[in-house]
Structure formats: structure tokens, C-alpha cells
């Protein structure tokens, strides 16, 4: 009977070790995907702010030239 208990414990232990390793790899992959998503979001925000700054500068120049032309 003791032999069966030891065998069962060994089987359970050997099943839990790979399961633990798989969970760790899964967490690492999820972290990498999250990091990639964050990087893409930062790139999009940087591009959008660059476009808005350029548009604001052009609009400011246009308004400035219109007001100088009226004087």
C-alpha cells in the first residue's frame, strides 16, 4: 500500500512540474505581447502628436500671414 502511495505522489509531482513550467512560459509570452502593444501605442501617440504639432504650426503661420496681410 505504501508503494502505491509513493508511486501516486511521484506521478502527481511529475505532472505538476511541467504544468508549472508551461504556466511560466505562458506568463512570459503574455508579458511580451503586452510590451509590444504598449510600444505600438506609444508610436501611434508620437505620430499623432507630431501631426497635430505640424498642423498647429501651419495653422498659426496661416493666421499670422493673414493678419499681416490685412494690416
From Swiss-Prot:
Keywords of this protein's UniProt record, alphabetized?
Answer: Amidation, Amphibian defense peptide, Cleavage on pair of basic residues, Cytolysis, Hemolysis, Membrane, Secreted, Signal, Target cell membrane, Target membrane
Which residue ranges traverse the bilayer?
Answer: none
Q: Where is this region: Disordered?
A: 25-46
From the UniProt record, list the residues forming the propeptide: 23-45, 70-71
- Subcellular location, in the record's words? Secreted; Target cell membrane
Q: Name one GO biological process term.
A: killing of cells of another organism
UniProt feature, compositional bias: Acidic residues: 26-40
Q: Which family does it belong to?
A: Belongs to the frog skin active peptide (FSAP) family. Plasticin subfamily.
Reported function: Neutral peptide with no antimicrobial activity. May act in synergy with cationic peptides by enhancing their activity. Has a moderate hemolytic activity.
UniProt-recorded name of the protein:
Plasticin-C2
Source organism of this protein record: Agalychnis callidryas
